[in-house]
C-alpha cells in the first residue's frame, strides 16, 4: 500500500469512528443519544488506534497535518512528502465524513438542533474566548506531538524476541490512542479538542 493510500484509509477510519460517535451521541433518535463526553473521547481514542494500526506499517500513520508538519519541522520526515500525506489525510477525512453522513442521514433529518448537526463534523468552543481557545488547542497539539516525537525517536530501543515492529504502526498505537483520550478528557471540554491545524 502506498503512503498516500495508507494516510487516506487510516484517516477515513479515524473520522468514520470519531464522527460516528459524535453523531450517535448528539443526533436525535440514535441508540447512543446523550451518552456523553466520556463515550465521545473514548471512541475518538479507539478511532485513532484503528487508524494507526491500519496506516502505520505503510506511512507511519500521521493521520493529521499537525503530525506531518511537526515531524518535518523536527527533521524526522522529508518536506517533499508533506503535501502527499496531507492530501491523503484531507481526502480520507472527507470520505470518512461522507460515510458518517450517509449512515446517520435519517438522524440528521430528525435533529432540529443545527449546532448538534454541525458538531458531528467540527469542533467549536463551549465559551468563545478565542485567545484561551487557541491556547487550549495549542497545548493539546503540543501534548500530542510530544508523545509522537517520543515514540518515533530513533534513540529509543526495545529488546524483545518478538518480530513486531515498534513505532506508530504497532505497539505505538496504544500510547498515541491513550494520549488522544487523555487530551480529550482533560483539555477537550473547552473546544472539543481538534488538536489539528
Residue spans for each PLM region:
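Membrane-interface helix-loop junctions and terminal tails of multi-pass membrane proteins
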Residues: 1-197
Amino acid at each position: 500500500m502506498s503512503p498516500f493510500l495508507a494516510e487516506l484509509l487510516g484517516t477515513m477510519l479515524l473520522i468514520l469512528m470519531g464522527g460516528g460517535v459524535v453523531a450517535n451521541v448528539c443526533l436525535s433518535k440514535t441508540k447512543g443519544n446523550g451518552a456523553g463526553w466520556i463515550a465521545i473521547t473514548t471512541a475518538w481514542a479507539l478511532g485513532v488506534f484503528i487508524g494507526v494500526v491500519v496506516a502505520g506499517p505503510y506511512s507511519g500513520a500521521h493521520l493529521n497535518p499537525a503530525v506531518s508538519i511537526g515531524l518535518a519541522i523536527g527533521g524526522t520526515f522529508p518536506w517533499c512528502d508533506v503535501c502527499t500525506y496531507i492530501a491523503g489525510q484531507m481526502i480520507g477525512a472527507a470520505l470518512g465524513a461522507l460515510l458518517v453522513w450517509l449512515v446517520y442521514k435519517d438522524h440528521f433529518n430528525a435533529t432540529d438542533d443545527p449546532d448538534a448537526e454541525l458538531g458531528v463534523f467540527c469542533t467549536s468552543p463551549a465559551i468563545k474566548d478565542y485567545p484561551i481557545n487557541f491556547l487550549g488547542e495549542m497545548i493539546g497539539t503540543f501534548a500530542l506531538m510530544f508523545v509522537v516525537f517520543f515514540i518515533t525517536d530513533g534513540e529509543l530501543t526495545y529488546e524483545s524476541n518478538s518480530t513486531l515492529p515498534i513505532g506508530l504502526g504497532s505497539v505505538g498505537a496504544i500510547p498515541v490512542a491513550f494520549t488522544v483520550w487523555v487530551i480529550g478528557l482533560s483539555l477537550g471540554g473547552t473546544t472539543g479538542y481538534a488538536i489539528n491545524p
